[in-house]
Swiss-Prot record:
Topology class, membrane: Multi-pass membrane protein
Annotated transmembrane regions: 4-21, 37-57, 62-82, 112-132, 141-161, 181-201, 202-222, 236-256
Catalytically driven reaction(s): alpha-ribazole + adenosylcob(III)inamide-GDP = adenosylcob(III)alamin + GMP + H(+); alpha-ribazole 5'-phosphate + adenosylcob(III)inamide-GDP = adenosylcob(III)alamin 5'-phosphate + GMP + H(+)
Xref: Pfam families: CobS (PF02654)
Cellular compartments per GO CC: plasma membrane
Function: Joins adenosylcobinamide-GDP and alpha-ribazole to generate adenosylcobalamin (Ado-cobalamin). Also synthesizes adenosylcobalamin 5'-phosphate from adenosylcobinamide-GDP and alpha-ribazole 5'-phosphate.
EC assignment: 2.7.8.26
This protein's name: Adenosylcobinamide-GDP ribazoletransferase
Species in which this protein is naturally found: Geobacillus sp. (strain WCH70)
Similarity field: Belongs to the CobS family.
Necessary cofactors: Mg(2+)
GO biological process, one term: cobalamin biosynthetic process
Top class in the EC scheme: transferase
Amino acid sequence: MKAAWSGFLLSVQFLTVIPIRKQIDWNAATARWSVRAFPLVGALIGVIEAVTYFIFSSFSSLSPLFLALSLMWLSIWIAGGLHADGWMDVSDAFFSYRDIKRRQEIMSDSRVGAFAVLSILCLLSFRFLFVFETIRSHLDIFLISVIPLLSRTAMAWLLIYGKPAKQTGMAAAFREHADRYDAHVAMIIGNCLLACLCAIHFSVWKTVIFLACGTIFAVFVARLFFEKQFGGITGDALGAFVEGVETWLWCMIWLLRSYVMV
């Protein structure tokens, strides 16, 4: 139980800006439990975002424009910009059109290139559009918590099932200890949390299933893409995946609300 709690705290330290003052020892047990706790951290992030949105929308007259912008930036801030940085590094490397080895070197470079700036602007512009249009047409507050939960659960699967691009870095450090069993535990935890959400608010179950299918599709596409373009999975690749899949899930919700109305 101590290892499980330490693993959860390690995930919170790594994936969020929530201050955890405790020094967590890095070992095989905490690393494995940290991967298993990815869905729990995703759910925690989702609850924070949902509660913030509820307060802003229920106790103020803030416009949908402000609500959409606040929700989008909160998701980036609470992760400490970690995933956004990964998206930018991957974009710089991909649009360099170099060989795999050179792309890996570019991802490790701390400098920000023009393509990184353009790609993050494009990503956030489209996400803002999807969030804003969804809020205008009616956003179910429970779905706000589903998106981070799905993205972090999927990140655990991509981390374990994707081929590591190199033997150093964050992804390699986790892969040294975690295996497919840990990915399966993360999936079970994620599914249980989704089931709890659907039990609390049953009317969203169709949308949740649709989003889960979209997430599974995104994992397979991302795995093929990163292995072909970068030789495998890195920490930056995982960060880019989280940013990309969250934008993709917001797009799916917008499409459902605009054309299917489930």
